[in-house]
């Protein structure tokens, strides 16, 4: 199922109205710790500290520490444009209720000027709806990637990375025309991010002549994949695994123990270091898995990327290489800091100067140039990758092709079972 823009507007408006009622009932001060005239700018950071993506807070802090460390600051703050920037962290469990509660606390109790985050897709949609109710606060996304967040989002909300459908661009054509996959079984988590991520792949795959020959949408946190593996049709050419974090690692492990011999196509976060670095025994399932996303392969190098990787490696609890979450949080937080500096820390007039800089930002990030479109959505470079085994036995990405200047489309996806559902 796909949603048109009219339906999306109605959904966001309804969600925003419901949150507005909840906000009014809760009382308390709304944001604006600086309100343009003080010497302190408060930034509230949302990141997952529990659940399937519990590592999100560590990755967020690593990214922020790298960005602020380059300005003689640390994970808790720095001096930016003559203002004291104070960071307040709020952990979530990846659910909408948790994200809403923590965002409201940051704005209405802690009095932050800017909300930065969250990590996951459903959280992101909730935060956009909340942003509609507090227009005096600026929101900069962390890594949440549903398509609709910026297509019809709040004017005070900015995203400095691609959406999850953009990330799979080119992979569907490659699967059919280069890999020869004609029938693919769909396995993915049942929430907004995988809908768009899988939709971006399968719309292209189906248009190229491919067929979805079965589908399983599973709850986040699923631990038993044996029954799903058993029902994969024998004539399947490949399995699409739209899973992330602990779920992806669990599936890959069970794919090995249950004798899955079909090639795999990974959703963007299924091939992330957070899934590939935990179990050395998953190589037989993971090697050869193709995917697309914002993280380049192991051979990628430029001075900005190399500096980022080196600084990331010094952070507590760092993965062998920067995860997608660390990269997106870094690119997004650095974008915020560059804009604060360009605005000279001015948050007056409903943060007009800051928002103008955010809307028009252009810079060379570790993974390529970032510019913004009229919807406050980034135009970015994208990487199609394949999982390979390095000489030391570790699983890493190897880039197949790079696409520069990828722009957002206008299709928002829901659950689908067949190619006919997304045509």
Where are these regions (language model features)?
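Short, low-complexity disordered leader/linker segments with a strong preference
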Residues: 1-42, 418-423
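Beta-alpha junction/loop-to-helix N-cap segments that form part of ligand/metal-binding clefts
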Residues: 4, 29-35, 55-62, 74-151, ...
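Extracytoplasmic "Venus flytrap"
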Residues: 37, 41-67, 71, 90-97, ...
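Short, solvent-exposed amphipathic alpha-helices that sit
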Residues: 56-75, 98, 167-170, 192-211, ...
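Extracytoplasmic ligand/sensor domains, especially the bilobed periplasmic-binding protein
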Residues: 112-217, 263-291
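Extracellular/periplasmic periplasmic-binding protein-like sensory domains
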Residues: 255-330, 342-344, 398, 403-422
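Short, charged, surface-exposed loops that flank catalytic or proteolytic processing sites
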Residues: 341-356
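Solvent-exposed, acidic/polar segments of extracytosolic/periplasmic ligand-binding ectodomains
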Residues: 359-423
């Amino acid at each position: 199922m796909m949603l048109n823009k009219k339906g999306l507007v109605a959904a966001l408006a309804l969600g925003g109205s419901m949150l507005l009622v909840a906000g009014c009932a809760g009382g308390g001060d709304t944001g604006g710790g600086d309100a343009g005239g003080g010497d302190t700018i408060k930034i509230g950071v949302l990141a997952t500290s529990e659940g399937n993506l519990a590592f999100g807070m560590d990755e967020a802090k690593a990214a922020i520490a790298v960005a602020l460390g380059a300005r003689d600051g640390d994970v808790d703050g720095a001096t930016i444009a003559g203002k004291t920037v104070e960071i307040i962290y709020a952990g979530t469990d990846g659910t909408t209720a948790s994200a809403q509660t923590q965002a409201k606390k940051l704005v209405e109790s802690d009095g932050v000027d800017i909300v930065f985050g969250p990590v996951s897709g459903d959280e992101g949609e909730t935060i956009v709806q909340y942003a509609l109710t507090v227009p005096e606060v600026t929101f900069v996304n962390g890594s949440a990637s549903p398509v609709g967040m910026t297509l019809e989002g709040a004017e005070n909300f900015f995203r400095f990375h691609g959406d999850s459908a953009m990330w799979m661009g080119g992979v569907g054509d490659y699967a059919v025309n280069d890999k020869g996959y004609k029938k693919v079984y769909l396995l993915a988590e049942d929430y907004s991010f995988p809908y768009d991520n899988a939709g971006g792949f399968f719309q292209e795959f189906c248009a190229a002549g491919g067929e979805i020959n079965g589908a399983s949408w599973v709850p986040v946190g699923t631990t038993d994949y044996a029954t799903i593996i058993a029902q994969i049709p024998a004539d399947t050419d490949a399995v699409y695994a739209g899973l992330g974090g602990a779920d992806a690692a669990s599936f890959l492990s069970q794919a090995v123990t249950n004798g899955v011999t079909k090639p795999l196509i990974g959703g963007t976060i299924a091939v992330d270091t957070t899934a590939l670095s935990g179990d050395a025994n998953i190589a037989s399932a993971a090697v050869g898995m193709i995917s697309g996303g914002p993280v380049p392969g192991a051979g990628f190098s430029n001075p900005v990327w190399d500096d980022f990787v080196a600084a990331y490696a010094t952070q507590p609890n760092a993965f062998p290489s920067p995860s997608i979450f660390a990269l997106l949080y870094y690119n997004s937080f650095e974008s915020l800091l560059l804009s604060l500096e360009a605005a000279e820390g001015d948050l007056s007039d409903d943060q007009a100067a800051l928002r103008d800089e955010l809307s028009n930002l252009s810079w060379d990030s570790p993974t390529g140039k970032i510019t913004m479109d009229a919807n406050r959505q980034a135009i970015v470079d994208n990487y199609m990758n394949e999982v390979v085994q390095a000489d030391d036995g570790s699983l890493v990405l190897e880039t197949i092709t790079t696409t520069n200047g990828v722009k957002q489309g206008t299709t928002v996806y829901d659950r689908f079972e067949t190619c006919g559902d997304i045509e």
